Amino acid sequence: MAFQDLITQIGCLGRFQILHLIFVLICFILVVPHTVLENFTAAIPSHRCWVPILDNNTMSDNNSRILSQDDLLRISIPMDSNLRPEKCRRYIQPQWDLLHLNGTFSTVTEPDTEPCVDGWVYDQSTFLSTTVTQWDLVCGSQTLNSVAKFIYMTGIFIGHLMGGHLSDKFGRKFIVTCGLLTLAVTETSVAFAPTFLIYCSLRFLTGISSSCIRTNSALLILEWTSPKFQAMVMALIFSAGGIGQVLLGVLAFGIRNWQHLQLAMSVPVFFLLIPTRWLSESARWLIITNKPQEGLKELIKVAHINGIKNSRDVLTLEVVKTTMKDELEAAETKPSPLVLFRTPNLRKRICLLSFVRCVSLISTVGLLINLQYLSNKVFLLQCLYGVVCTPANLLGNFSMNYMGRRTTQIIFMSVMGISILSITFLTQEMQIPRLVLASLGGAISSASLTSTAVLSNELVPTVIRATALGVIGIFGSAGAALSPLLMILMTYSASLPWIIYGVLPILSSLVVLLLPETRNQPLPDSIQDVENKRKSSREVKKDAVAKVTPF
């Protein structure tokens, strides 16, 4: 017997689970968008240097009063290679000769230019204000925008490292509550951050709390749900994240001031703290941490909410201890992560799966947090990403069942890479093709992550599955954290980051060929099962060679 037998006695999917699931779904709808919020709050609008003759309203000049804005811009700002005004330099002196006022003057030497020493003028047609316009994160300081995203993703990485340990020590409910409070306070404070350094510090704390909330809220509902409903619950949770992205796109379209949008996405999180007082702690965690009496109390409460009668007669302390005997013994001997690397076949699987997860998240995060570089229709693209999330996961589930896990993963990662690479060959004027390819890449990346998770779960043995998935998850979080830094390479070439984002999944798809297929295969229960499978495959190859050798 196991804890799932107790779940069966109190109701597999009753009123209690539905209410808890609704709470978790709302959490994901409100929390997930904070990862991609900087697509709008940190968007980089069109900009140019501030020049006195054009932007100083008090300045009076006989020539400037009769010239159009385009003419004034022409004599003040040099043109780049695309014949557009330079974003980071201006003429030291107005170049009146460029207007050919005398009709005969020709410039012999290139006019002297200088950086934007007086600041910048920003286009407000799309965004009234962003963090970029507030702290002038353009030109020489543009890399700080990527650094801010890196700091947030590093927070998620730290949260992934801390979340599991804190959850095992203090419980799922406590960590979810603390995470919601921290996220609500930090993200609300972000809107009033006086300096860029404070802004980055608050976003770092947001990353930690966001990771803890998502991990532990999902864990909380899964530990109260029967295994046969867990796949459905996870699908709903992924879909909730997609709904959150659509919500963000709609709000960002209506709210063009970054501080107002920040508050619109942060203040509602405070209201999630109200229902946390009625959340039930995981009975499984309570029992395993030597709190069987409290665990029993939670089980009886859940049975009552689900309408199970006479639960006090069926559920006793002795029944709970007997049912959880095996899990209590397993909890006393927690395997070290080093166990994963002591045997050759398991070590190979862990290394390959970690590489695939890391690369998948580098490209996926690169797509999600850099929408502005993919299309001018950033609001529409954000909504499309959210909309395609659910059908993409359904497609992935169908493909894994009929084509196999490995084949599905190879196809999805290859298509994702090709989609990203194709965008680099399209000009900014080709908005519809760029929008289609970006949406396709986003959809496939979501399905690819799902298939990666399934493959990882089925390739590691039960006895150390939690430890193995934790190690693989750490490598994935590291990839997500590194992803924003690749955008710094745009200072050398505008296409270079996207070429890397596209090439990495294609290379990773080749690595998947080294992993075994798991469709319709029994899950390995022990490390010996993994190693025996390797030996048996070798014996099969030897037998095949022996049979063909005589011929």
Curated annotation (Swiss-Prot):
Task: Using the UniProt annotation, give all residue ranges assigned to the region (Disordered).
Answer: 524-551
Q: List the disulfide bonds.
A: none
Swiss-Prot/TrEMBL catalytic activity: estrone 3-sulfate(out) + glutarate(in) = estrone 3-sulfate(in) + glutarate(out); 17beta-estradiol 17-O-(beta-D-glucuronate)(out) + glutarate(in) = 17beta-estradiol 17-O-(beta-D-glucuronate)(in) + glutarate(out); dehydroepiandrosterone 3-sulfate(out) + glutarate(in) = dehydroepiandrosterone 3-sulfate(in) + glutarate(out)
List localization entries. Cell membrane
SUPFAM superfamilies, A to Z: MFS general substrate transporter
Q: Which InterPro entries match?
A: MFS_dom, MFS_sugar_transport-like, MFS_trans_sf
Which ranges are annotated Basic and acidic residues under compositional bias?
A: 530-545
Lineage, top-rank taxon, reads Eukaryota
| Tissues/organs with expression | Localized to the kidney. Mainly expressed in the late segments of proximal tubules.
Give the record's GO biological process terms.
monoatomic ion transport; organic anion transport; response to molecule of fungal origin; steroid metabolic process; sterol transmembrane transport
- Does the keyword field hold Nuclease? no
Where do the TM regions start and end?
16-36, 146-166, 174-194, 204-222, 235-255, 260-280, 350-370, 378-398, 410-430, 435-455, 469-489, 496-516
Recorded GO molecular functions are: organic anion transmembrane transporter activity; toxin transmembrane transporter activity
Q: Supply the alphabetized keyword list.
A: Cell membrane, Ion transport, Lipid metabolism, Lipid transport, Membrane, Steroid metabolism, Transmembrane, Transmembrane helix, Transport
Output the Gene Ontology cellular-component terms.
Answer: apical plasma membrane
Coiled coil region boundaries: none
The record gives the membrane topology as:
Multi-pass membrane protein
User: Main role?
Assistant: Renal transmembrane organic anion/dicarboxylate exchanger that participates in the reabsorption of conjugated steroids, as well as bile acids, driven by an outward gradient of dicarboxylates such as glutarate or succinate. Transports estrone 3-sulfate and estradiol-17-glucuronide (17beta-estradiol 17-O-(beta-D-glucuronate)), but not androstanediol glucuronide (5alpha-androstane-3alpha,17beta-diol 3-O-(beta-D-glucuronate)), nor taurocholate. Prefers sulfate conjugates of steroids rather than glucuronide conjugates.
Protein name in the entry: Steroid transmembrane transporter SLC22A24
State the organism's lineage.
Eukaryota, Metazoa, Chordata, Craniata, Vertebrata
